[in-house]
Amino acid sequence: MFRKTADRLPVFLILSLTLVDFILYFTVENFWVLAVYFALTVVPKGCICSWNHHHQHTKTFRFTPLNRLLELVYALHTGVTTNLWLLHHVFGHHHNYLDQTIDESRWKRKDGTLMSEWEYTLNVAFTAYYRGYLVGKKHPHHYRTHVIYTALAVALVLALTIYHPLQATMLFTIPMVVGLFITAWVTYDHHAGLSETEDHFKASFNNINPVFNLVTGNLGYHTAHHYRQGVHWSELPALHDTIKDEIPREMYKTSFWEVFNNSFFLKLFGLSR
């Protein structure tokens, strides 16, 4: 059923969180309970954005219907529907990221200056579906699938909202909007400020923090991901090891995730130092 056994645990956890969402949808009417739940799940649901990204590169299941169902689940968490990132990210950004005049996730303004983090986030999030549409003109089959399943996702959320407006808003609508912005926001650190136009080894920042890579599916091995975008997320560390001597030291960045890089958290997450 699964293409890679490594996908079993993350899919189980994501589906479990989705089940909790629906249990609360049908059983909880208190705004404050829903608000606290939303606050507690912002970070976990934000991490789901990376797993949706991985799925767009290498499908999780062998059977298309299962992939479509999983994509509907991802849409409810991230606001990114079936094939949007396939068009925008896989067919778009990965082919164009060295050229900031056409990159779908471009971080340069038209005058060539660097966008701020928030300007970039707003720009990429607000234009995501439009830029997906532009890429879709070259891939009409994939775009038709995107339109069909986007309509299905919208219809589902609309039905949920009609039946239980408060619960649907707190559990689905707001998290979907926030998820889309998180998806855009986390990509800023991948390339922003790197004006490399030829060398892929100098065009991506990497974050090799073990906790970050545990919860995002090795998204921090970003040079390797662009070097061979079809490689499954579980195989990126091994691929990184084969090319790490080609990656300049300045292509490695640290982040707030370093706070977890101590013996307590590493043991908690089952990681070795």
Model regions and ranges:
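Conserved protein kinase catalytic core
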Residues: 59, 197, 231
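A short alpha-helix capping/helix-coil boundary motif
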Residues: 68-69, 197
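Non-catalytic, topology-defining segments of multipass membrane proteins
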Residues: 1-56, 62-68, 75-173, 233-273
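Polar-ligand-bearing catalytic/cofactor-coordination segments
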Residues: 194-198, 228, 238, 245-246
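Short, surface-exposed loop/helix-turn segments at secondary-structure junctions
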Residues: 198-204
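Cytosolic juxtamembrane regulatory segments of multi-pass membrane proteins
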Residues: 72-80, 205-221
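Transmembrane alpha-helical segments that form the membrane-embedded catalytic/substrate-channel core
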Residues: 42-55, 172-198, 218
